[in-house]
């Protein structure tokens, strides 16, 4: 009885080790598909990174350049070439609008790039997104006091600022436009055609 129990435990242990080995192996393979953000970005990395990972790799590389001095984000980003500026700003816009709409974009530090974004979007070939963002910028400037009136620094105040917010219509338009003209694909195509602009 004791011998068969010991054999069962050993067998189970071996099975667990084999499963862990294969599980870890798969995780390692997945992580190897994405270059470390600690390495300089090279043409080879851009060429060998899949389309679904390229934007993240480039953004990570750009964000790493900010990390030590994030409080100077605006100045640092504007010191980059136009291509890097565009990808960084568009990624911020897309993340904010997809998470909480244009209202959240303007509320957070990403809003500091609002005026520069239409040109950045045009640069990468996203002209319809540029037009949409110009209209959202114009509405925000005209309706700023109404939009920000409830934003008192509390979660409740920010949540209340979505009620009857004139920016809400732009959120819906952004989502529908992105279904037709994928903004991430537009950026990936731009990066591939202009890869020297992104290498370190």
Protein language model features and the residues they cover:
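A generic structural signal for short
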Residues: 2, 105-106
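Bacterial N-terminal signal peptides that target proteins for export
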Residues: 2-11
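Hydrophobic helical h-region of N-terminal Sec-dependent signal peptides
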Residues: 10-18
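C-terminal motif of bacterial Sec signal peptides marking the signal peptidase cleavage site
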Residues: 21-23
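Bacterial signal peptide processing site
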Residues: 25-27
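Extended, alpha-helix-rich binding/interface surfaces that flank or overlap catalytic cores
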Residues: 32-88, 94-99, 106-113, 120-200
């Amino acid at each position: 009885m004791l011998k068969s129990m010991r054999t069962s435990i050993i067998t189970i242990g071996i099975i667990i080790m084999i499963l862990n080995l294969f599980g870890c192996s798969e995780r390692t393979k997945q992580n190897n598909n994405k270059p470390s953000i600690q390495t300089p970005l090279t043409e080879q990395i851009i060429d060998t990174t899949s389309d679904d990972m390229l934007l993240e790799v480039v953004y990570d590389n750009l964000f790493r350049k900010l990390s030590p001095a994030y409080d100077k984000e605006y100045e640092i980003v504007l010191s980059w070439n136009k291509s890097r500026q565009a990808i960084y700003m568009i990624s911020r816009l897309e993340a904010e609008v997809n998470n909480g709409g244009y209202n959240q974009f303007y509320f957070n530090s990403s809003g500091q790039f609002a005026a520069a974004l239409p040109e950045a979007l045009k640069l990468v070939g996203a002209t319809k997104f540029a037009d949409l963002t110009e209209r959202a910028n114009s509405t925000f400037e005209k309706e700023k006091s109404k939009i920000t009136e409830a934003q008192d620094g509390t979660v409740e105040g920010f949540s209340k600022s979505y009620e009857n917010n004139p920016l809400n219509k732009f959120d819906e338009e952004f989502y529908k436009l992105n279904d037709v003209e994928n903004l991430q694909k537009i950026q990936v195509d731009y990066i591939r055609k202009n890869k020297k602009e992104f290498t370190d």
